Amino acid sequence: MKFKYCAIFFSGFLGLSAILAACGARGKFDQVDDGKIKLAFSLTSKSASNALQAIVKKYNEVKKPGDYHIEITQIAGGYDGGRSDLQTRVNVKDTTNFYNLILNYPDLVSTLGRVGMELLFDKVNTDKLSDRFLDFNKRISAISKPGIYGIPVSLSTEVLSINGPVLHYILKSAKGDSDNVKVSQRTGETTQKSKVTNPLKINTQNDPATKDLWEKIEASAKANGKSNKDGQTKGKKKVEKSSSSSLVNLKQSTDQTTTDDGSQKSDNKIKESWGEYQEVDGGLKNFEFKASIFENWHDLLDFSTRVAKSFTNVKGKDIKKGTDIQGVLGVDSTPNSLFTSVFAAGGGDYNNFFYKIENGRADFSNFKNKGTSYQNLQKVFGDFKGLIDKNGIFVNKGGSYSSNFQKFHQLAYSISSTSGFFYSFAGNSAKRLKFGDNFIEFPRFTQEIKAPSTENGGQSNLLGTFEVKDSSKSKEVKKTNRKEDGAQNQGKKESDKKTIYLYKSQIPSDKTEGENAILIKEQNVINQLEQAAKKDEKGETVTNKVASLETKAANAKKDSSKTIIGYTTTDNVHEDGKNIFKINKLKTEDYDRKIIVGATEEVLEQSSTLQSDEAIVLPAPGKYQSGDAKKVTITQGPNIIGIHANEKENAETQKFVNWFLNNTESWEVKNGKDSSTKQQTAAEFFAESASYILPLKEIFDKDNKKATENKDNNTSNKKQANTYAEKALDLFQQISKGDIVSYSDPSDFRSGKFRDGIGSNFNAAVSSKADFDRFVKGFIATLGSEI
């Protein structure tokens, strides 16, 4: 009652910060001093996780005697899982199992601030960081006093990644000047084919930006369809793993004597899935293509809608299978797209946004009272609506990212995070697992499950086996005396693998759950593994359906124990209850293990996939309309956030964070199979390992020496150049100079609910083709009485 009375008395005169300070205890509690610092981590990125483990190991090695050691507390469920876990521990006042630090978004600071559990980093030197990237601390509600509560150690932004070969086919078809390009025109019940009569125009004469973009688009198509020095198409080297239909197509293409530069071959390949171009009103007839289309939301959505109208394979399918063209534009984060477009439409001013932080409180009145943000949302939604109605947009509804489809030419372009570069493109040998009309890209960190055989016991209880790396085994047997072991044994390599057994009813006494055995409980998985093994006995195993005759002949000579009946992975794939299921993981594993059954492995030609050098990477649209005065770029990524524990642990926590930001150490940096040692801070090591940007002042200086050095290293080393990180760095430099307005969500304990609500309701509107009134009504309903 004391707090309630106090809040009422002061609310008319003071901001929330003053109220909280004046009212004393607000649920704050001390954690038990257990002599260690716990860092909560919920990111799903393996590279980020591995980097953080290396950092913790390093700190515990170099810390002074008496300093607290640090350990990682793993939380499942990504950022949302971390948010939920922290809220629960705050609510129950967890004094024994709470943590001191968490990597997450700054709305968690507001959640902590409501009960006085936020930790001010007043003993951490943040002088190395650019001030503009610390400004978000001024937009956090419920904190008791101004200061640094969140430190951005892993920044990313969003880019517009164009599938060059696909856009080339679209534009070249609409231009009508490629070889044998014809257009479908529907007249009554018949479809007639004719030359393009109202061609699209590309002004390369008077528009340097458009000229440059078109040249890049042409180059990407040439790369996609070009021939190797020996005259083979670039997918030919992998043909022995391609499907029989691909073999036929490849033979036809190589039998033809062509002298084109590769772009025509690329167009022909894209046409197989995208279909014929159609001249329609409101499409690309007489349309002028400009590079500036991709700079603002209004023009981008208008152009995308025109493309969707021009291809039946896009507009004509309300329900799309996984193997269909998914749309023209892919959007990985619909909240990001809606927030940045509305923010840009409001002149890059938080006073015109959905909500703002003022006097320590979040003010949602602009949206609630149907002010500028509500009106701008209505305009933005209206631009999206045309694309939605023509089935031209793909949205991520929970783990199915645009890149999963764009890399297989199923989207023309997409907007996604710069942290996802290494997931965004196909490799030289692109593989995927097909389940009927759907598929997933062949996951990383995946093992094949082999059918049981007499060699591994032949028990009816045994479903199959797979192998994992055994770190306890030596990779090479040491050389021994010739007289004792013979020359033939010297330097002989020993397998560094161990076999894991999958059982269906019980694990035998000579095996141990989580060490060399896993018990499968899901009956659907058991049935599909057993069916696959039975098919193998008849020579009908599904995993070889797409193999060439050469591969099948080789497989026929193999023992049945080599037959693949499924797959298991620790990669971040989502279980669907049909083909992908969660199973128990091994004791040595940090990530959930999944099992994949009923799948057909398919290896694709490179011309059927998007390589990194065939993509054109642009900033995500920075304006709502071309005439807007300010350009906006989103800044996002997890921050280091401190949590109050007790006086000693608070001091030790700040000591670690200060070391993390400022102390230079030696780090092993892997580059493919090679590795080298690099001198840098833990923060720099973490950001580089996870494809993030650390906002250091020195990389934003006018002379930009460090940025140039980083870019040179990126393009000259053996790894593929990270064009997403390069674009992010360029945008962040412009933010630092004040040339671009940075957007990040104002941080309030209700921010997550607002973000999730607008995203889920927009995604539902994409599926149902709802109008604005229905969309916004559903959105407001999800917010409840809290907002």
Curated annotation (Swiss-Prot):
Top-rank taxon: Bacteria
Residue ranges with Basic and acidic residues bias: 209-219
Biased composition (Polar residues): 181-208
Biased composition (Low complexity): 242-261
Segments for region (Disordered): 178-270, 473-495
Intracellular or extracellular location(s): Cell membrane
InterPro entries noted in UniProt: Lipoprotein_10_C, Mycoplasma_lipoprotein_cen_dom, P68-like
Keyword Cell membrane: yes
Cellular component terms per the entry's GO annotation: plasma membrane
Recorded topology in the membrane: Lipid-anchor
Lipidation (S-diacylglycerol cysteine): 23
Keywords: Cell membrane, Lipoprotein, Membrane, Palmitate, Signal
Keyword Cell membrane applies: yes
Signal peptide per UniProt: 1-22
Residues lipid-modified (N-palmitoyl cysteine): 23
Family: Belongs to the MG185/MG260 family.
NCBIfam families: lipo_P68
Name of the protein described by the UniProt record: Uncharacterized lipoprotein MPN_288
